[in-house]
């Protein structure tokens, strides 16, 4: 009986399609020449597991699963369109304006508080910004933005944590502003939404990225505001800005190229973790120090600078801030003071999850209940 079963199986194998394939045409499946054998996304995760498990300890598993999960977005209302109508429509979706909720409904500090009161400059938030998010734990999505009656898009979808560096910059009416690494344009658009920029210089080294920035501006900003006397878009080497326009700006945003941690875990295209870009990735902190130093040199004495990344790495965050401050002190005898943003963290803790142990600045860490970020930002004042 057993012999009959074996013979039957053998006959079935002989009749199977793959049994008729000539031996010379049988081969193992090979990777396409354009498909990496070890994807950049896997390299990124391997790198993060090695470094961030040490940096964040017990917090890393929670951050890790959040990074690998769907990101949460905010809707930045376009004040140049019918802003009040758009806000009402977003409220009907049960979304909330987290900026208005935090800034205008903050609780006053108790009189017997032991913490030192922050300076008025560090308290200031850039005005007129409206950004709606869904509450913690609500994973609803915003519908795609529409073209309004004025020919401009109603709102801009972005990681709501990306708005924090702009808020921290504390723009005042009539400020001259530099966005040193402006593309793809979300923060530049937010700067213009404040209505405070007497003129704005938006720069990015990549011409393809500045083209994308221009498309964002054309979709959201009226022609008269985009006038070259008010908004100037350039593709210069940001590291040389201190030589080009030193001591010029009231406010400077330095949102540097970084490992873009969340993007690197989900996208293969143009990933900084591609093997061909290994040296570029290793040199990122050097580039970041150079860009921040240039931004500080471009700032007027008494002006303010915000440095930001979308990376969790303290090598790209706190260490870069400290390195640039030392560089300016040693080479230019320029003193820079880091602003305390503890109060800022308290303002927005209902919307974002903050890492509690940054040496300088603040870091939004991804959390499944509030899956924004990562976003690091540090505010500085150029003293001399």
Curated annotation (Swiss-Prot):
List the catalytic residues: 310
UniProt: S-adenosyl-L-methionine binding residues: 185-187, 204, 209, 237-238, 255
InterPro entries to which the protein is assigned, alphabetical? MeTrfase_RsmB-F_NOP2_cat (IPR049560), MeTrfase_RsmB-F_NOP2_dom (IPR001678), RCMT (IPR023267), SAM-dependent_MTases_sf (IPR029063)
Q: Quote the transit peptide annotation as a residue range.
A: 1-25
Q: Tell me the enzyme class.
A: transferase
- Catalytic reactions on record: a cytidine in rRNA + S-adenosyl-L-methionine = a 5-methylcytidine in rRNA + S-adenosyl-L-homocysteine + H(+); a cytidine in mRNA + S-adenosyl-L-methionine = a 5-methylcytidine in mRNA + S-adenosyl-L-homocysteine + H(+)
What EC number(s) does the entry state? Answer: 2.1.1.-
List all disulphide bridges recorded for this chain.
none
Task: Provide the GO biological process annotations.
Answer: mitochondrial RNA catabolic process; rRNA methylation
- What domain of life? Eukaryota
> According to its record, what are the GO cellular component terms?
mitochondrial large ribosomal subunit; mitochondrial matrix
Cellular location(s): Mitochondrion
MF-aspect GO terms:
methyltransferase activity; mRNA (cytidine-5-)-methyltransferase activity; rRNA binding
Q: PROSITE patterns under this entry?
A: SAM_MT_RSMB_NOP (PS51686)
**CDD domains from the entry?**
AdoMet_MTases
Phosphoserine is carried by which residues? 206
Chief localization: mitochondrion
Q: Which UniProt keywords apply?
A: Methyltransferase, Mitochondrion, Phosphoprotein, Ribosome biogenesis, RNA-binding, rRNA processing, rRNA-binding, S-adenosyl-L-methionine, Transferase, Transit peptide
Query: What does this chain do?
Result: Mitochondrial RNA cytosine C(5)-methyltransferase that methylates cytosine to 5-methylcytosine (m5C) in various RNAs, such as rRNAs, mRNAs and some long non-coding RNAs (lncRNAs). Involved in mitochondrial ribosome small subunit (SSU) maturation by catalyzing methylation of mitochondrial 12S rRNA; the function is independent of MTERFD2/MTERF4 and assembled mitochondrial ribosome large subunit (LSU). Targeted to LSU by MTERFD2/MTERF4 and probably is involved in a final step in ribosome biogenesis to ensure that SSU and LSU are assembled.
Record's subunit section: Heterodimer with MTERFD2/MTERF4; this interaction seems to be required for NSUN4 recruitment to the mitochondrial large ribosomal subunit.
What's the family? Answer: Belongs to the class I-like SAM-binding methyltransferase superfamily. RsmB/NOP family.
Would you tell me the protein name for this molecule?
Answer: 5-cytosine rRNA methyltransferase NSUN4
């Amino acid at each position: 009986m057993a012999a009959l079963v074996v013979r039957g199986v053998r006959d079935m194998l002989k009749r199977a399609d793959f049994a008729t394939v000539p031996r010379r045409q049988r081969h193992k499946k090979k990777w396409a020449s354009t498909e990496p054998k070890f994807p950049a996304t896997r390299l990124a995760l391997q790198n993060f597991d090695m470094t961030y498990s040490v940096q964040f300890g017990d917090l890393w598993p929670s951050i890790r699963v959040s990074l690998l999960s769907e990101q949460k977005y905010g809707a930045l209302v376009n004040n140049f369109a019918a802003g009040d109508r758009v806000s009402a429509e977003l409220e009907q979706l049960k979304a909330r304006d987290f900026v208005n909720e935090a800034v205008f409904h903050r609780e006053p500090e108790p009189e017997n508080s032991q913490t030192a009161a922050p300076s008025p400059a560090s308290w200031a938030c850039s005005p007129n910004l409206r950004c709606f998010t869904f509450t913690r734990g609500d994973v609803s999505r915003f519908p795609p933005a529409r073209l309004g009656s004025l020919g401009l898009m109603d709102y801009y979808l972005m990681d709501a944590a990306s708005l924090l560096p702009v808020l921290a910059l504390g723009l005042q009416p009539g400020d001259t502003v530099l966005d040193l690494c402006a593309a793809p344009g979300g923060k530049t658009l937010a700067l213009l939404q404040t209505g405070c920029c007497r003129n704005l210089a938006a720069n990015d080294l990549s011409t393809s990225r500045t083209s994308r920035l221009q498309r964002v501006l054309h979709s959201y900003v009226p022609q008269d505001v985009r006038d070259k006397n008010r908004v100037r878009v350039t593709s210069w080497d940001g590291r040389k800005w201190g030589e080009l326009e030193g001591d010029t700006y009231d406010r400077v945003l330095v949102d540097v190229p970084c490992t873009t941690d969340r993007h690197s875990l989900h996208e293969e295209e143009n990933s900084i973790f591609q093997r061909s870009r290994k040296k570029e990735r290793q040199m990122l902190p050097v580039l970041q120090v150079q860009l921040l130093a240039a931004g500080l040199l471009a700032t007027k004495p008494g002006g303010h600078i915000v440095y930001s990344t979308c990376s969790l790495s303290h090598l790209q965050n706190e260490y870069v801030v400290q390195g640039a401050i030392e560089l300016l002190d040693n080479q230019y005898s320029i003193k820079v003071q880091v602003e305390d943003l503890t109060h800022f963290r308290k303002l927005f803790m209902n919307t974002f999850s903050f890492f509690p142990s940054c040496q300088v600045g603040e870091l939004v860490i991804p959390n499944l209940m509030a899956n924004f970020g990562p976003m690091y930002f540090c505010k500085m004042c150029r003293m001399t």
